[in-house]
């Protein structure tokens, strides 16, 4: 079976610098572009967007929410679902010990993301999370009913999946002070006389998704993923990296 993949390279102002829609050479016109069209399960890559970023931001705005990089959280299931503890971590286990939020994110602990989400002060934590990722990070493929639950928001088991392009644009906010830019693939279009017919103005799509403080903390947390967490095998030598790993059922998506 052929393994497929997709990639988007984008600068911090939304300009798409490179895009790969699948492995191998292009064989057809208007074929499937997996980077922009395929909706795949995000797994744990959703956690910074649906849990950690929103939780840190909430702590700046709500005195009843106190969630920080150093917050101590128990590595244990949050609740019992159908007679079974939920969630468990990769491999089905949990330690029962107390760890920092930073460690839980770096090691991609499902228990920590679920408990962090539950710590958001008001009863509508899941609604807050879904609204944040949909309207601040512009992930457009989420189901407003089916994905408004702990499993989709805390562990990434969403209904329809997400695209690589939208995830790239969302993650860029952690590296540019919290600003979201709509991704674009052109700068301008001219007619045969050289008249500008269409010109992209990225600043018009600029929105504040996160405070500068939250973006800075998230950047540092995601650097830990690459230096001392699940992403150590993927870091680039000599380049400061931040990122997040994600794996779905039976390793179908990574």
Please provide the spans of the model-predicted regions.
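A penicillin-recognizing enzyme superfamily signal
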Residues: 1-9, 18-19, 25-38, 65-66, ...
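Secondary-structure capping and boundary motifs in well-ordered enzyme cores
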Residues: 6-13, 38-46, 93, 97, ...
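Glycine-rich, acidic and aromatic/proline-enriched surface loops and short helix-turn segments
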Residues: 9-25, 57-59, 78, 97, ...
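Active-site SXXK
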Residues: 14, 41-73, 104, 170-174, ...
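Extracytoplasmic/secreted envelope proteins and their assembly/folding machinery
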Residues: 29, 33, 52, 70, ...
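Conserved catalytic neighborhood of penicillin-recognizing serine enzymes
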Residues: 60-127, 192-219, 223-224
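Thr-Gly-centered strand-to-loop micro-motif
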Residues: 74, 115, 157, 243-245
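Mid-domain, small-residue-enriched loop/turn segments at the edges of structured enzyme/sensor domains
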Residues: 85-89, 121-168
């Amino acid at each position: 079976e052929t393994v497929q993949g997709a990639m988007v390279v984008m600068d911090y102002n939304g300009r798409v610098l490179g895009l790969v829609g699948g492995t191998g050479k292009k064989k057809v016109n208007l074929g499937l572009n997996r980077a922009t069209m395929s909706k795949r399960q995000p797994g744990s890559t959703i956690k910074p967007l649906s849990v950690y970023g929103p939780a840190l931001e909430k702590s700046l705005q709500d005195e009843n929410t106190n969630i920080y990089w150093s917050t101590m959280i128990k590595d244990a299931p949050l609740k019992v679902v159908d007679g079974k503890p939920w969630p468990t971590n990769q491999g089905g286990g949990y330690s029962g010990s107390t760890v920092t939020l930073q460690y839980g994110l770096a090691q991609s602990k499902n228990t920590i993301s679920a408990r962090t989400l539950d710590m958001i002060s008001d009863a509508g934590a899941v609604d807050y999370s879904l609204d944040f990722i949909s309207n601040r990070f512009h992930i457009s493929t989420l189901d407003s009913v089916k994905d408004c639950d702990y499993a989709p928001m805390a562990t990434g088991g969403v209904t329809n999946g997400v695209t690589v392009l939208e995830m790239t644009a969302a993650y860029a906010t952690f590296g540019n002070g919290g600003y979201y830019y709509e991704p674009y693939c052109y700068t301008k279009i001219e007619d045969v006389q050289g008249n500008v017919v269409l010109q992209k103005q990225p600043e018009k799509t600029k929105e504040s998704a996160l405070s500068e403080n939250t973006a800075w903390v998230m950047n540092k947390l995601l650097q830990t993923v690459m230096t001392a967490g699940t992403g150590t095998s993927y870091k680039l030598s000599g380049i400061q990296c931040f990122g997040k790993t994600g794996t779905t059922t039976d390793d179908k998506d990574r």
